[in-house]
Amino acid sequence: MKKPYFVSITLFITIAVLILDQVTKAVIAKSMAIGDSYTVIPKFLYITSHRNNGAAWGILSGRMSFFFIVTIVVLGLLVFFYIKEAKGNFLMQVAISLLFAGALGNFIDRMLHGEVVDFIDTKIFSYDFPIFNGADSSLTIGVILVLIALLFDSRKSKV
């Protein structure tokens, strides 16, 4: 039986997530000054305008050339992995689409603005989690789905 690629679905997911990410960042950048914050759910969720020229928690701040190179390599590896390993695995294809969209979304910010627009600000059990954006969420969900897909794949091979 021929294993399919779900190209139209994965392209739709990638493009939709990328557009949503870029539009939300543009709205925040245009309508809020850096540091402005609005409460969505008191003591839990805020929209806070923030800029980050590093990775999560400001790691490697100001190392744009490093991020450019790493992102290009990662995007290439994701395409390779999609073609070579994800055939017939719908969940893995969705996961790779989310990873690709997230990496590309933050890459676009770094290329155009030299920094990433972050705005989702959460406090979980009094821990003030680092401010993040839609691309970061896409990357996180993509990683979780890759792990789930690999778990299911390893279980199938044992049966």
UniProtKB/Swiss-Prot annotation:
One Gene Ontology cellular component: plasma membrane
Residues of the active site: D118, D136
Gene: lspA
Gene Ontology terms describing biological process: proteolysis
InterPro entries with a match to the protein in the record: Peptidase_A8 (IPR001872)
Segments forming a coiled coil: none
Topology of this chain in the membrane: Multi-pass membrane protein
Location(s), subcellular: Cell membrane
Residues annotated as transmembrane: 4-24, 64-84, 88-108, 131-151
Function: This protein specifically catalyzes the removal of signal peptides from prolipoproteins.
First-tier enzyme category under EC: hydrolase
Family matches, as HAMAP family: LspA
Record bears the keyword Signal: no
Pathway: Protein modification; lipoprotein biosynthesis (signal peptide cleavage)
The organism's place on the tree of life at top rank: Bacteria
Protein name (database record): Lipoprotein signal peptidase
Predominant cellular place of this UniProt entry's protein: membrane
EC number of this enzyme: 3.4.23.36
Family, as annotated: Belongs to the peptidase A8 family.
Reactions the enzyme catalyzes: Release of signal peptides from bacterial membrane prolipoproteins. Hydrolyzes -Xaa-Yaa-Zaa-|-(S,diacylglyceryl)Cys-, in which Xaa is hydrophobic (preferably Leu), and Yaa (Ala or Ser) and Zaa (Gly or Ala) have small, neutral side chains
Keywords per UniProt: Aspartyl protease, Cell membrane, Hydrolase, Membrane, Protease, Transmembrane, Transmembrane helix
GO molecular function, one term: aspartic-type endopeptidase activity
